[in-house]
């Protein structure tokens, strides 16, 4: 099995599940036990500053770095936060995914947001998407998802409303030309 860790899953037009329709999901873990990822293009109705307020974390006023939205990372564990950011060694609970991407789950990164210790770019998600053993592979076989290597430019510098389209452009073909039977000989 080839791991899709540090890849982006792109929902194909055939995927009509309202939770995942037109989503781009960053895969944090993929092995024989299953997969776990974070949806990166569904802003929640919650700003970063509102979340910090709810957690009683003090932050500098009028900081542009904190004006963005929190993202709906997926339907599982919606009270759990994940921060995707460029690698830094400052945090208690981090996993380096590549030379360009790290995922942190500890509160200390939230406490640093808006300060000079904060990562220069970040996506903050609540919840995650999870797949049981073999489930993601089955969905890939059904043409529900396509995968590309993770792209920091797409993660950190592309507006969320454009991430699905930009990701599909990296596939090298028109995703709208896919049929439900592609790959099934």
Swiss-Prot record:
Gene3D superfamilies: VC0467-like. GO terms for cellular component: cytosol. SUPFAM superfamilies: VC0467-like. InterPro entries: AlgH-like. It holds the Pfam family DUF179. Belongs to the UPF0301 (AlgH) family. PANTHER family: UNCHARACTERIZED PROTEIN YQGE, UPF0301 PROTEIN YQGE. This is UPF0301 protein IL2218.
